[in-house]
Amino acid sequence: MKTLYSLRRFYPVETLFNGTLAXAGRDQETTGFAWWAGNARLINLSGKLLGAHVAHAGLIVFWAGAMNLFEVAHFVPEKPMYEQGLILLPHLATLGWGVGPGGEVIDTFPYFVSGVLHLISSAVLGFGGIYHALLGPETLEESFPFFGYVWKDRNKMTTILGIHLILLGIGAFLLVFKALYFGGVYDTWAPGGGDVRKITNLTLSPSVIFGYLLKSPFGGEGWIVSVDDLEDIIGGHVWLGSICILGGIWHILTKPFAWARRALVWSGEAYLSYSLAALSVFGFIACCFVWFNNTAYPSEFYGPTGPEASQAQAFTFLVRDQRLGANVGSAQGPTGLGKYLMRSPTGEVIFGGETMRFWDLRAPWLEPLRGPNGLDLSRLKKDIQPWQERRSAEYMTHAPLGSLNSVGGVATEINAVNYVSPRSWLATSHFVLGFFLFVGHLWHAGRARAAAAGFEKGIDRDFEPVLSMTPLN
C-alpha cells in the first residue's frame, strides 16, 4: 500500500538536513522531507497524519476552553463586555446564554460550563492525537479501509468532502435549533433595547436569502454583510445547512465528472491549497462582518461599529444642544450645511457634520427616530428616550479605534482611555489571518501544480555556486 509509487517522484523537493533525527518511516530518506517540514513527512502515513490532526484539534479546543475560563474569571458584570477585552463571552452572549434585556449579564454559569466542556473535550482529543501519533497504526488502509485513502483516489476524496459538508450542515442547523427551540438567541433589535427571544417567523424565501448574494458589496448595499434581522440570519442558516447536507450526500454517492477530473489537481498538497483558499475567503468575509454588522455581532457585547460610534456622537450633541435651546432643524454649521441635520444625496434627513459619510448606518437605538424620509424632526424633538441617550453616549466614547498598546480612541485625543474594541481585534486578526492563508494558498497551489506537471523549480544542490566559494572564515 505504501509503495505504489516512488515518493521521490511525487515529492521531488530535496530538503537536505540531518535525517537521523526522525523515527523509522518518517525520516528524510523515506519521505523526501526533513523533520522541520512537519506534516509533509506524513503525506502517505494516514494513521500518523490522523494523529497530527486530532492533536491539533485538541490544541484548538484546549485554547477555547482555557480562554473561556480565563474570561469568566476576569469578567466584571458591572462593565460592558467590550470594555473588558473579551472575545469569547460576546459570542456566547449572542447565542442567548446568560443574558437578559438590554444585553445585561444575569448569569455567568453557562459561560463556566462552556469552558469546562471544551477543556474536557480537549483532553479526549489530546489523548486521541497522542495515541494515533505514537501508538496507532502508521497507515489505516490495511486495518480500517473506511478511514484509509490514497490522495489520487478521486472517488474517495469526494466522499471525504461529502462527509465534511454534512458535518458543516449539521453545525449550521445547531444554530437554527438553538434559535427556534432551545431558548432563542439575543436580538439587538428587540423593542426597548435588545433581548433574548425565540425566532418564530423564519425567512425561507429564496429571493430574500439569495438576494443578499446578488447585492453590491459597496456603499449602502453591503452584500451579505448588510443583513440586519435575525429571521434572515437563521433562515439563511436553514438554507445553508440544507445545501451543505444535500451537497454532502451528493458527493458521497457520486464520482467526479470527467471535466472535474481533468481540471483539478488531485494530490494532498492541492487539497491543502484549496482548503487554504476557502479559509482565506472566510477570514475576509468575517472581517467585514464583525466590523460593519451590529445584528450578528450586537454592539451591546462587541461595542459599536465605527459608523455607529460616529453617529452616536452626532446624536449625543444634538440632544445636548437641543436641551440648551438650539433649533436643530435649522442651525447652520461652519460649512454652510446643517450643523445637526442635513439631507443625503437622495433626500433623506441625516445627521450633519463629519458623520454624514455614515448616513446609511442602521442601529437599534436610532431607528425608532426615523420616519418615511429619514430622521423625523418631530420625533427628535419629542420622542427621544433616556435609554437611547445613555446608549449613544456610551457608544460615542467607545469607538472601535485603537493602537496595539491599548490606548484607545482617536489618536489625537488627550483624554484617551485604556480601551480597544473587540471589533478592532476581531476584524484586524481575521483580515491578517485571511491574508496569510491566501499567501499559503498561492504557495501550495504553485507547488502542487508544479509537481503535477512533472517539473519542479529549485536549486540543484549538487552544484550550488556557494560550494565552490572560499569559506567566510
Curated annotation (Swiss-Prot):
UniProt source species: Eucalyptus globulus subsp. globulus
Protein known as: Photosystem II CP43 reaction center protein
Matches recorded under SUPFAM superfamilies: Photosystem II antenna protein-like
Keyword Glycoprotein (UniProt): no
Entry membrane topology: Multi-pass membrane protein
Entry's cofactor comment: Binds multiple chlorophylls and provides some of the ligands for the Ca-4Mn-5O cluster of the oxygen-evolving complex. It may also provide a ligand for a Cl- that is required for oxygen evolution. PSII binds additional chlorophylls, carotenoids and specific lipids.
HAMAP family in alphabetical order: PSII_PsbC_CP43
The keyword Transcription is assigned to this record: no
